[in-house]
Amino acid sequence: MSLKSERRGIHVDQSELLCKKGCGYYGNPAWQGFCSKCWREEYHKARQKQIQEDWELAERLQREEEEAFASSQSSQGAQSLTFSKFEEKKTNEKTRKVTTVKKFFSASSRVGAKKAEIQEAKAPSPSINRQTSIETDRVSKEFIEFLKTFHKTGQEIYKQTKLFLEAMHYKRDLSIEEQSECTQDFYQNVAERMQTRGKVPPERVEKIMDQIEKYIMTRLYKYVFCPETTDDEKKDLAIQKRIRALHWVTPQMLCVPVNEEIPEVSDMVVKAITDIIEMDSKRVPRDKLACITKCSKHIFNAIKITKNEPASADDFLPTLIYIVLKGNPPRLQSNIQYITRFCNPSRLMTGEDGYYFTNLCCAVAFIEKLDAQSLNLSQEDFDRYMSGQTSPRKQESENWSPDACLGVKQMYKNLDLLSQLNERQERIMNEAKKLEKDLIDWTDGIAKEVQDIVEKYPLEIRPPNQSVAAIDSENVENDKLPPPLQPQVYAG
């Protein structure tokens, strides 16, 4: 993809983000500008062409061998192995290396493959010797619970997924490109089976494929991310060194339409950097893409707040380059390669995830090829900045003033905020102490009033009257009763 740098800033024609074959999907530098679908077609064509050339070479060598054999009568009995057998053996070895997803779902091939695999490797199957990590167990449980809602279709998907993981366990010696091809074939085959046989709606197919990707890549991550057989780590170190060497690049040089003096914009920039750094902590390609998407949306929000209008593509790419330079994400190339190799290809070909990922690839390519002309600098200044002899930031510091330095302005603003917070805290503490004193005084006053009342009106407890009723007693004071009620004594 060609990147153009003009005085008004970095510009990328949006058509250059698309597949160069003209299919309408997003292309990728790792696929030589093709989309996933077209790249696979071109790759298979080149592969078939190479196989055909090897076949023709083998036939030519066989003819030469036969001619030499016919001309040499003395060596007829000594030669026990003809070149045809050698050719057959070579062809069988090539055929064995061709891995397609049909091998994973064909019953006959599974039986034969398992026998050969058992003989070649004695390691236990990952379905038996499962990883015990908490994350893997959690993802497995979530995947099983998710498939339960699909009943018979879910059982078939789970069976196919387990077979795929078992097959991949014995294919770790293959190159990372061949393992990637196996994974992409598996994605494509499962999606086609659900759409044709299962009659599953496209939106549900997408959700199922997301869960399948999450399940299998969580298990395969430590084997296929930045493997030792590739130069991914070397590329990571190279891009990190390159970004550190470009630490002097300012937003003005890239024509970044973002004003970090605005607090909301500064927060968005920090969030964007955090998101793109967080990408390395994710294990699933879809989750890594989600970090790129969140980073990009924060960039668009920062531009929108600064310009008070929606951001354009010409505004987005320079800002993304600036975020990458400022954040220097860890293992950037490894993450890009991992997403390219093992993400569900439909995500990279269409949608906002594919668009943002393609722009990130463009940003990395721009950083790798960045020169004086790209930044509208003279070659002399560019060389001085790269060598560390001087820096544009040093030149700005010569005319330093508190109002001109963004960092110092932010520092004074923060100090003012701290001073205000300190005053508020002192007021709150004084009011809290006053409230505490009032509560103590109120409690003491209530206690004193209660004590005064108790002393003034003491509580006396008297024993109950134990006297019995004396109605028939002679000691009753009858004289106090009215005459009709006075008892009369009769002589008996």
Swiss-Prot record:
Modified-residue entries (N6-acetyllysine), positions: K152, K171
Region of interest: Interaction with ubiquitinated proteins: 1-74
Modification comment: Monoubiquitinated.
Residues recorded as bearing Phosphoserine in the entry: S125, S133, S374, S378, S391, S401
Keyword terms of this UniProt record: Acetylation, Coiled coil, Cytoplasm, Endocytosis, Endosome, Metal-binding, Phosphoprotein, Protein transport, Transport, Ubl conjugation, Ubl conjugation pathway, Zinc, Zinc-finger
Domain of life assignment: Eukaryota
Binding locations of Zn(2+): C19, C23, C35, C38
Tissue: Detected in brain.
Subcellular location field: Cytoplasm; Early endosome; Recycling endosome
One MF term in the entry's GO annotations: zinc ion binding
UniProt entry tagged with the keyword Coiled coil: yes
A20-type Zn finger ranges: 13-47
Chain residue ranges for the region called Disordered: 66-85, 471-492
Biased composition (Low complexity): 69-84
One Pfam family in the UniProt entry: VPS9
Stretches assigned to coiled coil: 408-449
Effect of A58D: Strongly reduced ubiquitin binding. Loss of ubiquitin binding
Domain (VPS9) ranges: 233-376
InterPro entries the UniProt entry points to: DUF5601, VPS9, Vps9-like, VPS9_dom_sf, Znf_A20
Function comment: Rab effector protein acting as linker between gamma-adaptin and RAB5A. Involved in endocytic membrane fusion and membrane trafficking of recycling endosomes. Stimulates nucleotide exchange on RAB5A. Can act as a ubiquitin ligase.
Subunit field text: Heterodimer with RABEP1. The heterodimer binds RAB4A and RAB5A that have been activated by GTP-binding. Binds TSC2, GGA1, GGA2, GGA3, AP1G1 and AP1G2. Interacts with RAB21, and with 100-fold lower affinity also with RAB22. Interacts with ubiquitinated EGFR. Interacts with RGS14; the interaction is GTP-dependent.
Record-given protein name: Rab5 GDP/GTP exchange factor
Organism: Bos taurus
Gene name tied to this protein: RABGEF1
